[in-house]
C-alpha cells in the first residue's frame, strides 16, 4: 500500500459548507465559521507555509463561482515569487496574475465578508480528494489513499492529530471549554476568539471613527456604516441592508412570520432577541446599567440610546432643516415629514404612518388590546412605557426638571413641551392654515379639524370624536363617573382640568389676565369668553331670530327658548329647565343646601347673589339711589339701567321710525314690530308672539293660571 503524503495545506484544515447548509446556520454560527477559517489560515502563514501546491478554492460572489488556483513557485532573477491565476468558471480562459500578498488579501476579504460572500460547495479539484458528510452538516475533505492491490481508495489522514480532530466533527464533541462562562467549542481558535469578549480585547480598529472591535468580521460590517454599502437587497420591496441577518429579519415582515412567543402574555416576535428583551418586562430584570447616572435598562440598545443623553451627541443630521438626531432610524423617520411619505398603511382603515411603531399603536385602537395593567388601580395600557409613566402618578416621582423654573414632570416629552412655553417655540406647523404647535401630537389632533376625521365612537349614543381622551371624557357622562374630587369641599368632577379650575375658587387664584382691562379669571375658558366683550365678536347666529352669540354653547341654550326644549328634569318634583345650571340651583330648594356662607355671621345662602345682598347689611353699605325720584336700587347694573331711563340719552335708534331706546335689547324687540316678525310660537294653539315674555303670559291661559 502506497500513501501519498504531502506538506500540510490550507485544505487539510478547511471545513466547507454547501450553500444549503449555510442557510441552516444562524448569525452566530456563520460568524464563528468565518473566524475559524481565518484563524486557520493565519496559523498556516505563521508556521511558514508559503505555497499552496495544487489546492483549489471556490468562492461564491456576485453570482459567479471564482476558482483560485495556486501556481507552482517560479524562480527568477528577482528572487522567489508566487504567481496565482484567477479563473472564472463561467468565463473559462480568463486569467490574471496575482502576487502572494494579493492572494492573502483576497482570501481574507472573501472569508470575512458578510454572509453573501461564502465558500461554495464545490469540491477541491485535486485528484484523489472526496468529501465526507458529518452529522453536523459539515463537508470535510479527506485525502485518498491508493491501494497497491487495485484501484480502491479509502480515507486516510496525514497524522493522528488530524484524525482526532476529524472524529470530533462526527461525534459532535466540543472539547474546548471557556473557563469564564463554561461555553464549549470544537476549535481552539474559536475559543480564543470567544475569550476576547471576557477580556475586553478589541484588536481591530476603525480608521474613520476609531471604534474598536474584537473580530475583524465585526469591523468590516461596521465599515459599511461609513461607506453606506448595503449589498443585501430585499426581493419584495428592494430595500437594502448592510448585513444578511438584518435582511432575514426584514423578510419576516413580508411573510408575517413571528416564531418567538411570550409564555406570559402570548405576544409574538420576529426575532429571538426581541422576545428576550420583552420577557424582562415581566420579570423586571434590567441588567444594563448606565455608568453615569446608574439608571438600568432591559436592553443594551436602550442603554446606548440613553448614553447619548449624557454626551449630548447627535451624529445624524437632516440635510433639509439641519435638525440632529441620536439615531439613524429617527433621522429616517424625520425625513418622511419633508417628503410626506407614509409607507406603513393600516389594513383596517387605510390610514398611513411614518414609522411601524405608530402603526402598531394604531392597530390597538381597532383591536382594543391593552395587555399592561397597573397593580395599584387596575388601569390598562397598550404599551409598557405608558404603564411606567402612569405608575409615576402613584409614586409621585417626577424625574424630569425644567432648568428655567425647576418644575418637575413625569415624562421627558412633557418637560420638552413645557420648555417651549419659556422659549415660545412652536416648531410644528399646519400645512393647511399655518397654525403652529409646541407638540406634534397637538398638530395631529388639529389636522383632524381640516379632514373631519373622527375615529373614536361612543358605544352608548354613537357620537364620534377625533381624540381618544375626548371619547373617554364623554363616556363619563353616561357612566356618571367623577373620579376627581376636591379636598376642600368634596365636590367631584369628570375632568382633572375642571378640578384645577374649581380649586382656584378656594385659593382665590386668577392667573389668566385680560390685557385690555386687567381683569383676572381662574380659567382660560372664562378669559376667552370675556375677551369677546372687547372684540364684539359673535360668530354664532340664531337662524330663528338672527341673534348672535360669542359661543356655540350660548347659542344652544338660546335655541331651546324657540323649541321649548327643557332637557334637564328635577327628579324630586318633575320640573324641567333649559340649562343644567338652573337645575342645580333649583335642586338646592329640595336639599336645603346653602354652600355660600357669610364671613361675618356664618349664615348660609343657596345663591351667591343673595349672600352679596346680605353682606351689604353688615357693612351698612349705602344702597344705590336713583337721583330722579330717590328710589333705592340694590344692584349696580339696575342703577345703570335706571339712570338711562331718566337721562335724555337714547343711543339706540330705530332706522324705520327714528324712535330711540336706551338699551339694544329694547331696540331689537321694537324692530320686530316693523318686520312683523313673531318668532315665539305657542305649541297649544299655534299663536305667535314677537316677545318671549308675551308668549309666557299667553301660556298661562292654557294652564289656567292667573298672572
UniProtKB/Swiss-Prot annotation:
Transcription regulation is among the record's keywords: yes
Tissue-by-tissue expression: Ubiquitous. Mainly expressed in fetal tissues.
Cross-link (Glycyl lysine isopeptide (Lys-Gly) (interchain with G-Cter in SUMO2)): 473, 625
The entry's keywords: DNA-binding, Isopeptide bond, Metal-binding, Nucleus, Repeat, Repressor, Transcription, Transcription regulation, Ubl conjugation, Zinc, Zinc-finger
Main location: nucleus
GO molecular function: DNA-binding transcription repressor activity, RNA polymerase II-specific; sequence-specific DNA binding; zinc ion binding
GO biological process per UniProt: negative regulation of DNA-templated transcription; negative regulation of transcription by RNA polymerase II; regulation of transcription by RNA polymerase II
Ranges of residues in domain KRAB: 8-78
Cellular component GO terms held in the UniProt record: nuclear membrane; nucleoplasm; nucleus; transcription repressor complex
A UniProt-annotated Pfam family: zf-C2H2
UniProt-listed Gene3D superfamilies: 6.10.140.140, Classic Zinc Finger
Database matches in SUPFAM superfamilies: beta-beta-alpha zinc fingers (SSF57667), KRAB domain (Kruppel-associated box) (SSF109640)
Family designation: Belongs to the krueppel C2H2-type zinc-finger protein family.
Known function: May be involved in transcriptional regulation as a transcriptional repressor. The DEPDC1A-ZNF224 complex may play a critical role in bladder carcinogenesis by repressing the transcription of the A20 gene, leading to transport of NF-KB protein into the nucleus, resulting in suppression of apoptosis of bladder cancer cells.
PANTHER family from the UniProt entry: ZINC FINGER PROTEIN (PTHR24381), ZINC FINGER PROTEIN 235-LIKE (PTHR24381:SF452)
Assembly description: Interacts with WT1. Interacts with DEPDC1A.
Protein's recorded name: Zinc finger protein 224
Biological source species: Homo sapiens
Gene responsible for this protein: ZNF224
Amino acid at each position: 500500500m502506497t500513501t501519498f503524503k504531502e506538506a500540510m495545506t490550507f485544505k487539510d484544515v478547511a471545513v466547507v459548507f454547501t450553500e444549503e447548509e449555510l442557510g441552516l446556520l444562524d448569525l452566530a454560527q456563520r460568524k464563528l465559521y468565518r473566524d475559524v477559517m481565518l484563524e486557520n489560515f493565519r496559523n498556516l502563514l505563521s508556521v511558514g507555509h508559503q505555497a499552496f501546491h495544487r489546492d483549489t478554492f471556490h468562492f461564491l460572489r456576485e453570482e459567479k463561482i471564482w476558482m483560485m488556483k495556486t501556481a507552482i513557485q517560479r524562480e527568477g532573477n528577482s528572487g522567489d515569487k508566487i504567481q496565482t491565476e484567477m479563473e472564472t468558471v463561467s468565463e473559462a480562459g480568463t486569467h490574471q496574475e496575482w502576487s502572494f500578498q494579493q492572494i492573502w488579501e483576497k482570501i481574507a476579504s472573501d472569508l470575512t465578508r458578510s454572509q453573501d460572500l461564502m465558500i461554495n460547495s464545490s469540491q477541491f479539484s485535486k485528484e484523489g480528494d472526496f468529501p465526507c458528510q458529518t452529522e453536523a452538516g459539515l463537508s470535510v475533505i479527506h485525502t485518498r489513499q491508493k491501494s497497491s492491490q487495485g484501484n480502491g481508495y479509502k480515507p486516510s489522514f496525514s497524522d493522528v492529530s488530524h484524525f482526532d480532530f476529524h472524529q470530533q466533527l462526527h461525534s459532535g464533541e466540543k472539547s474546548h471549554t471557556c473557563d469564564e462562562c463554561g461555553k464549549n467549542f470544537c476549535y481552539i481558535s474559536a475559543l480564543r476568539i470567544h475569550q476576547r469578549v471576557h477580556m475586553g480585547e478589541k484588536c481591530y480598529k476603525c480608521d474613520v471613527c476609531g471604534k474598536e472591535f474584537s473580530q475583524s468580521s465585526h469591523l468590516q460590517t461596521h465599515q459599511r456604516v461609513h461607506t453606506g454599502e448595503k449589498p443585501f437587497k430585499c426581493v419584495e420591496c428592494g430595500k437594502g441592508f448592510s448585513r444578511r441577518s438584518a435582511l432575514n429579519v426584514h423578510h419576516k415582515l413580508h411573510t408575517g412570520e413571528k416564531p418567538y412567543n411570550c409564555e406570559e402574555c402570548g405576544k409574538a416576535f420576529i426575532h429571538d432577541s426581541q422576545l428576550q428583551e420583552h420577557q424582562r418586562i415581566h420579570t423586571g430584570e434590567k441588567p444594563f446599567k448606565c455608568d453615569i447616572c446608574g439608571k438600568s435598562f432591559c436592553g443594551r440598545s436602550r442603554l446606548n440610546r440613553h448614553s447619548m443623553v449624557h454626551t449630548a451627541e447627535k451624529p445624524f443630521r437632516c440635510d433639509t432643516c439641519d435638525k440632529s438626531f441620536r439615531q439613524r432610524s429617527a433621522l429616517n423617520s424625520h425625513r418622511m415629514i419633508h417628503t410626506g411619505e407614509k409607507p406603513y398603511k393600516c389594513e383596517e382603515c387605510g390610514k398611513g404612518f411614518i414609522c411601524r411603531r405608530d402603526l402598531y399603536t394604531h392597530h390597538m385602537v381597532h383591536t382594543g388590546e391593552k395587555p399592561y395593567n397597573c397593580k395599584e388601580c387596575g388601569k390598562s395600557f397598550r404599551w409598557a412605557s405608558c404603564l411606567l409613566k402612569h405608575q409615576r402618578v402613584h409614586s409621585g416621582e417626577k424625574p424630569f426638571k425644567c432648568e428655567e423654573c425647576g418644575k418637575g414632570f413625569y415624562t421627558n416629552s412633557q418637560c420638552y413641551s413645557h420648555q417651549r412655553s419659556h422659549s415660545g417655540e412652536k416648531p410644528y406647523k399646519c400645512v393647511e392654515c399655518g397654525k403652529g404647535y409646541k407638540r406634534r401630537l397637538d398638530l395631529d389632533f388639529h389636522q383632524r379639524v381640516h379632514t373631519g376625521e373622527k375615529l373614536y365612537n361612543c358605544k352608548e349614543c354613537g357620537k364620534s370624536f377625533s381624540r381618544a381622551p375626548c371619547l373617554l371624557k364623554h363616556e363619563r357622562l353616561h357612566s356618571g363617573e367623577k373620579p376627581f374630587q376636591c379636598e376642600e369641599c368634596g365636590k367631584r368632577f369628570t375632568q382633572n382640568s375642571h378640578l384645577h379650575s374649581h380649586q382656584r375658587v378656594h385659593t382665590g387664584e386668577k392667573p389668566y389676565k385680560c390685557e385690555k382691562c386687567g381683569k383676572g379669571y381662574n380659567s382660560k375658558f372664562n378669559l376667552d369668553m370675556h375677551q369677546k366683550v372687547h372684540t364684539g365678536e359673535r360668530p354664532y347666529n340664531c337662524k330663528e331670530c338672527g341673534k348672535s352669540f360669542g359661543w356655540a354653547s350660548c347659542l344652544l341654550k338660546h335655541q331651546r327658548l324657540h323649541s321649548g326644549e327643557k332637557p334637564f328634569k328635577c327628579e324630586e318634583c318633575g320640573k324641567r329647565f333649559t340649562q343644567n345650571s338652573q337645575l342645580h340651583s333649583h335642586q338646592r330648594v329640595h336639599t336645603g343646601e346653602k354652600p355660600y356662607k357669610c364671613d361675618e355671621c356664618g349664615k348660609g345662602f343657596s345663591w351667591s347673589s343673595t349672600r352679596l345682598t346680605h353682606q351689604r347689611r353688615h357693612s351698612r353699605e349705602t344702597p344705590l339711589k336713583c337721583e330722579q325720584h330717590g328710589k333705592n336700587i340694590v344692584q349696580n347694573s339696575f342703577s345703570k339701567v335706571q339712570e338711562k331711563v331718566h337721562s335724555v340719552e337714547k343711543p339706540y335708534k330705530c332706522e324705520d321710525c327714528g324712535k330711540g331706546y336706551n338699551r339694544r335689547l329694547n331696540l331689537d324687540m321694537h324692530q320686530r314690530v316693523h318686520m312683523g316678525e313673531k318668532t315665539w310660537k305657542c305649541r297649544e294653539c299655534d299663536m305667535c308672539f314677537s316677545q318671549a315674555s308675551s308668549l309666557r303670559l299667553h301660556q298661562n291661559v292654557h294652564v289656567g293660571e292667573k298672572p
